[in-house]
UniProtKB/Swiss-Prot annotation:
This is Large ribosomal subunit protein uL30. It comes from the Bacteria. Belongs to the universal ribosomal protein uL30 family. HAMAP family: Ribosomal_uL30_B. CDD domains: Ribosomal_L30 (cd01658).
């Protein structure tokens, strides 16, 4: 079995101005607070759920 968890690279491409508070806090939880900032996170269910909530602000790449 392959127990390797793939990583995803998430880049914020749009501003959080005008978004709901829960979406802003989701971005902060992902480690994003500025446009064009990127983070590499493990591809887990909780991270995918957070990304799904703010996918209109992000660019997602598999690694």
């Amino acid at each position: 079995m392959n127990n390797k968890i793939n990583n995803i690279k998430i880049t914020q491409i749009k501003s959080a101005i005008g978004c709901k508070y829960d979406q802003r806090f989701t971005l902060i939880g992902l480690g994003l607070n500025k446009i064009n900032k990127s983070v590499i996170l493990k591809n887990t269910n909780s991270i995918r759920g957070m990304v799904e909530k703010v996918k209109h602000l992000l660019k997602i790449e598999n690694m």
